[in-house]
Design a protein with these regions (language model features):
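C-terminal outer-membrane/trafficking sorting elements
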Residues: 332-373
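Active-site groove signature of glycoside hydrolases
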Residues: 113-117, 138-172, 229, 306
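An active-site-proximal structural segment forming one wall of the substrate-binding cleft
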Residues: 89-103, 124-154, 217-224, 296-297
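Short, acidic/polar
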Residues: 40-55, 135-144, 209-221, 285-296
Length: 373
């Protein structure tokens, strides 16, 4: 199904900044996800310039969401048989991003292998075993290529963990099954190489309470899944047919229970903050909502807040961010009072379904996306 949205590029990030005080450095975001849908087609110089901008804004944690998306995208030079028929082989993104991170002083998280075909069913035990085996092969290949790169902080498991897929939909669809047959072997293999592991679980307030979410994470960690970082998606931007997955008024209740369980198991708690609106535009949300999300995440105990995602920001958004941030630093005047009229240029982006994820069709006639499911 096709969905159309218009993004006002020139003022997109000014909306975000206008909700912050003049002490933007103390409350800024700590990083951003990059799914590669747009950066895969950019030059090394362009990516390096972007990383320098991110670093200057304090957004030093950059999560490359995928190494490979089954059948469609490949972002590093793989020799693995099951990745050779990938449609779009933009296999220099990881290399360009690593070099950019070293130049800028950022920290990279390398996404692993993603296959969304059976993930929401959820997968059977054999399917989980296959998913784990392929992730382990990708992990080994990434380590052989980039294991000595000091800019790499760790790896990111791109499969989204949601409680309601593992809550009795089938007899074998249990938390223990998910942990034993997929999460634990992948996590332990990465940690054995000296790389940290991050996951970004998703939840839906329409389907669960904070108590259910807390019990799910307690079961997951008790089963032996011990990542270094849980960056829970706040769900505020995501929606189905206009029905939001999470509400800014109550999202803190969910974040706090996850933070509590993470603390009990020695796992660092981050928040993956969704920047996009819940309406059909999927453009950057207004200043009040973004400020509320950021404040709530910090109050819940998040040691870092990283944004989803780079496609929502774009180069034009970073242009605006640099401009307003520089004014704030030099003149000590709240950013919201420094806005001046400027022209808006709208770019139309279309979306369709691809392999379990909503994806957009770009002017390059290649697939792109700017938000998670």
């Amino acid at each position: 199904m096709l969905v159309t949205r218009h993004i006002p590029h020139s003022l997109m990030f000014a909306l975000f900044l206008s909700g912050l005080s003049s002490h933007a450095e103390a409350t800024n975001l700590d990083g951003v996800f990059d799914a590669g849908w747009t950066t895969a087609y950019q030059s090394a110089d362009s990516i390096t310039h972007m990383h320098k901008r991110l670093h200057a804004l304090g957004m030093e944690q950059v999560v490359l969401q995928y190494a490979a998306v089954e059948k469609t995208h490949l972002y590093y030079p793989s020799q693995l048989d099951f990745l050779q028929n990938t449609e779009y082989k933009n296999n220099q993104l990881f290399h360009k991003s690593i070099e950019a991170s070293k130049t800028a002083g950022n920290k990279l998280w390398l996404g692993l292998y993603y296959d969304g075909e059976n993930w929401y069913t959820p997968p059977t035990v054999p399917q989980l075993d296959t998913l784990a085996a392929r992730n382990l092969k990708v992990l080994d290949e990434l380590y052989a290529l980039y294991g000595n790169e000091t800019a790499i902080e760790g790896v990111y498991i791109p499969q989204e963990i949601a409680r309601y897929y593992w809550d009795g939909l089938r007899d074998d669809a249990t938390v223990a099954t998910l942990a034993t047959h997929f999460l634990i072997p992948v996590t332990q293999a990465a940690q054995a190489k000296g790389w940290k592991v991050m996951a970004a679980p998703f939840y839906n307030q329409n389907l669960e309470t904070p108590e259910k979410l807390q019990a799910f994470f307690e079961s997951l960690f008790a089963a032996g899944f011990k990542p270094d970082v849980i960056a829970v998606q706040d769900g505020v931007g995501a929606s189905d047919a206009g029905k939001a997955h999470a509400n800014t008024a109550t999202v803190g209740n969910y974040e706090r229970v996850v933070a509590k369980v993470c603390s009990q198991y020695g796992i660092e708690f981050w928040v993956d903050m969704e920047l996009f609106r819940t309406d059909d535009s999927h453009a950057l949300a207004d200043k009040a909502r973004l400020s509320a999300q950021l404040d709530t995440a910090r109050a819940a105990g998040a040691t870092k807040v990283i944004a989803y995602d780079l496609a929502v920001l774009g180069n034009a958004g970073l242009d605006s961010l640099e401009k307003w941030f520089a004014r704030d630093r030099s003149q000590k005047i709240p950013i919201k009072n420094r806005r001046s009229p400027s022209k808006q240029h709208n770019t139309e982006i279309r979306y369709y379904k691809l392999n379990g994820a909503r994806v957009k069709a770009s002017q390059f006639k290649k697939t792109t996306t700017n938000f998670k499911i």
